[in-house]
């Protein structure tokens, strides 16, 4: 059976791995998940990530980050879902916790944070929020 929301699955795996204090988590890879992991690493929410395996069954290995034995990611929420897509213009990009968190946006220029999308004057689909 196919997965209906692979991005939500990735976020749930990260959330569950952090609850049991795992150092890393394996997720089936895709270009979009790779881009989301790249944004998470740039913003300091994960330590690193790599892709392992052959073409048909690539695995994205995400190394999680902790501070004082607590996960760096406090809340990870999927916003745009297959059942309800959320698209925003550059002026409507939401802020998370008054700028303490980030939103990840898929734009025509690639996957980026909401702040970068605002700076580049592009809108897109709001994938998730992290703080």
Curated annotation (Swiss-Prot):
Entry keyword Heme: no
Keywords: Ribonucleoprotein, Ribosomal protein, RNA-binding, rRNA-binding
GO molecular function: rRNA binding; structural constituent of ribosome
PROSITE patterns found in the cross-reference section: RIBOSOMAL_S8
Any single GO CC term annotated in Swiss-Prot or TrEMBL for this entry: ribosome
GO biological process: translation
Subunit (UniProt): Part of the 30S ribosomal subunit. Contacts proteins S5 and S12.
Family label: Belongs to the universal ribosomal protein uS8 family.
Protein's job: One of the primary rRNA binding proteins, it binds directly to 16S rRNA central domain where it helps coordinate assembly of the platform of the 30S subunit.
Name of the protein described by the UniProt record: Small ribosomal subunit protein uS8
């Amino acid at each position: 059976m196919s997965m209906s929301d692979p991005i939500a699955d990735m976020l749930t795996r990260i959330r569950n791995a952090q609850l049991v204090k795992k150092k890393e988590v394996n997720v089936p890879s895709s270009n979009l998940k790779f881009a989301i992991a790249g944004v998470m690493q740039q913003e300091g929410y994960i330590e690193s990530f790599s892709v392992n395996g052959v073409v048909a069954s690539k695995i994205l290995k995400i190394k999680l980050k902790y501070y004082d034995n607590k996960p760096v990611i406090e809340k990870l929420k999927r916003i745009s879902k297959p059942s309800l897509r959320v698209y925003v213009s550059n002026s409507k990009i939401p802020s998370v916790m008054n700028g303490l968190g980030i939103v990840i946006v898929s734009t025509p220029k690639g996957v980026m944070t909401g702040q970068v999308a605002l700076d580049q004057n592009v809108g897109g689909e709001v994938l998730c929020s992290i703080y």
